A protein has these predicted regions:
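Alpha-helical segments flanking ligand/cofactor-binding loops in enzyme cores
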Residues: 9, 35, 80-81, 135
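Alpha-helix/helix-capping structural signal
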Residues: 22-23, 77, 95-96
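Short, surface-exposed, low-complexity cationic segments
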Residues: 72-82
């Protein structure tokens, strides 16, 4: 919904990564393209009760995928735990999965189709009513997110 009294400012971006546990991939195979996901258990994030679409870059353009799976949740950490337990393939922000990828607990899949980074937004009331503390927080978020990514 659009609200004229709110301002949205991009403070950073996050890369979404598609991954699965090695055990899941041994049992079900490794998808070679986003189309292959239709034959896999996908662990989807819920936004407002709706299953989110996964985004991919394919042949220079962005495509979306909304598959089916045994589980969906509105909690990234819960989806991460399900993926680590070999329940399916998940697409989550890099900051949630990077440690598991580094340790080998998860394997990246479809890296040739990696989507563009997703913007991280700070949403706040109109600048007319913006307190110095809120302005400082939003500025700090932009600086911190830029260093973290």
């Amino acid at each position: 919904p659009q609200c004229d009294s709110l301002i949205a400012r991009t403070v950073g971006s996050q890369q979404m990564l598609t991954c699965a546990a090695p055990g899941y991939l041994v049992q079900h195979g490794t998808p070679q393209s986003p189309d292959d996901l239709a034959r896999h258990q996908c662990l989807h994030f819920l936004h407002g009760g709706r299953v989110s679409r996964w985004r991919f870059q394919q042949k220079g353009k962005e495509t979306a995928f909304q598959g089916c799976g045994r589980f969906s949740a509105d909690n990234g950490e819960a989806l991460l735990e399900l993926a680590l337990s070999a329940f399916g393939i998940v697409q989550l922000p890099h900051y949630l999965v990077q440690t598991a990828l580094d340790s080998g607990s998860l394997k990246s899949v479809l890296s040739d189709f990696q989507p563009k980074p997703v913007p991280v937004m700070a949403v706040y009331p109109s600048r007319k009513q913006l307190s110095p503390k809120v302005r400082a927080l939003v500025d700090m978020m932009g600086e911190a997110w830029g260093k973290a990514v």
